[in-house]
Amino acid sequence: MFYTTVGKIIKELNLECLTEISGIEERKIKDMNLNRPALQLMGFFEYFDEQRVQIIGISEMAYLKTMTPSQRRDAIERLFQRNIPCVIITSNQEPFEEFLEFSKKYGVPLLRTQEVTTRFMTNLSTFLTHELAPRITRHGTLVNVYGEGVLMLGESGVGKSETALELVKRGHILVADDAVEIRKVSEKTLVGEAPEIIRHLIEIRGIGILDVKNLFGVGCVKESERIDLVIQLETWKQGKEYERLGLHDQYIEILGIKVPTLVIPVRPGRNLAIIVEVAAMNNRQKKMGYNAAKALTERLQKQMSRGNGAE
């Protein structure tokens, strides 16, 4: 199971740590869902998921103010007794002393943000969705071409990196080369990025490692990109039938999501960069509802119908 840590969300979301607890930065978060513990402060813990980050907003704090000191103490202790990853107070509110006391007693990090509850929960949810999403690493190259995320797959040496370099020269954006980390961030969306150690780098045989960001500028690189199209490059195989009309869409399944795919044969003289550009534009056009192959078929059928009618 994938996880992130309290230390990462402190750094990413600029949180203030209100209590000093050993090992706080390594404390694991395994659930991308969040919880506002209104019912739990009332004493109802049925169906309570202890793995979720607990958010104390203005409403929860206002409810605690209506309690007597002994009721408030019991309510806060019941929450901290659970094996929760952390408690975050929003809107820069001052915590009750009981929050600080039981945070230290039970070793549960107590954090605070200046952001309002709704905005903070949106930002934290987005971060956790990315960090905890199912993922795999594929050997390939990911580029942004006319706004379409194109993942190029194929055997080593088939020309993925060279094609990506030519695309960058033509004004497109490199996301990842050689290794692409693919995350399933929703039931319909895959996002790819480069491992941090090789981010913005590209390998060209005969030259070596190139830093695309330094060579071409920050506008030519991107940290992550949605995967809209998969292009599988392969050496041209004599006698193999390749798609010539494009009537029947093909798909590849990655992490349970079907992504449109094309098989592009590679041989000397073919300009792969232009082919990838056109493939990206054509894929975008299909998503907008137009398919050139189907339009041609319809025109042919109409012409044949007119011809049969004339007879």
From Swiss-Prot:
Catalytic activity reported: [HPr protein]-L-serine + ATP = [HPr protein]-O-phospho-L-serine + ADP + H(+); [HPr protein]-O-phospho-L-serine + phosphate + H(+) = [HPr protein]-L-serine + diphosphate
Membrane-spanning segments: none
Sequence segments annotated as region (Important for the catalytic mechanism of both phosphorylation and dephosphorylation): 202-211
EC number: 2.7.11.-, 2.7.4.-
Region feature Important for the catalytic mechanism of dephosphorylation, mapped onto this chain: 265-270
Chain positions recorded as Mg(2+) binding sites: 161, 203
GO molecular function: ATP binding; magnesium ion binding; phosphorelay sensor kinase activity; protein serine/threonine kinase activity; protein serine/threonine/tyrosine kinase activity
Cofactors required: Mg(2+)
Signal peptide extent: none
Binding site for ATP: 154-161
Annotated InterPro entries: HPr(Ser)_kin/Pase (IPR003755), Hpr_kin/Pase_C (IPR011104), Hpr_kin/Pase_Hpr_N (IPR011126), P-loop_NTPase (IPR027417), Ser_kin/Pase_Hpr-like_N_sf (IPR028979)
Family matches, as Pfam families: Hpr_kinase_C (PF07475), Hpr_kinase_N (PF02603)
Assigned keywords, A-Z: ATP-binding, Carbohydrate metabolism, Kinase, Magnesium, Metal-binding, Multifunctional enzyme, Nucleotide-binding, Serine/threonine-protein kinase, Transferase
GO biological process, one term: regulation of carbohydrate metabolic process
Active site per UniProt: 139, 160, 178 (proton acceptor), 244
Complex formation: Homohexamer.
Similarity comment: family membership: Belongs to the HPrK/P family.
Leftover remarks: Both phosphorylation and phosphorolysis are carried out by the same active site and suggest a common mechanism for both reactions.
Record's function text: Catalyzes the ATP- as well as the pyrophosphate-dependent phosphorylation of a specific serine residue in HPr, a phosphocarrier protein of the phosphoenolpyruvate-dependent sugar phosphotransferase system (PTS). HprK/P also catalyzes the pyrophosphate-producing, inorganic phosphate-dependent dephosphorylation (phosphorolysis) of seryl-phosphorylated HPr (P-Ser-HPr).
Domain characteristics, as noted in the entry: The Walker A ATP-binding motif also binds Pi and PPi.
Name recorded for this polypeptide: HPr kinase/phosphorylase
Origin organism lineage: Bacteria, Bacillati, Bacillota, Bacillota incertae sedis, Caldicellulosiruptorales
Name of the gene encoding the protein in the UniProt record: hprK
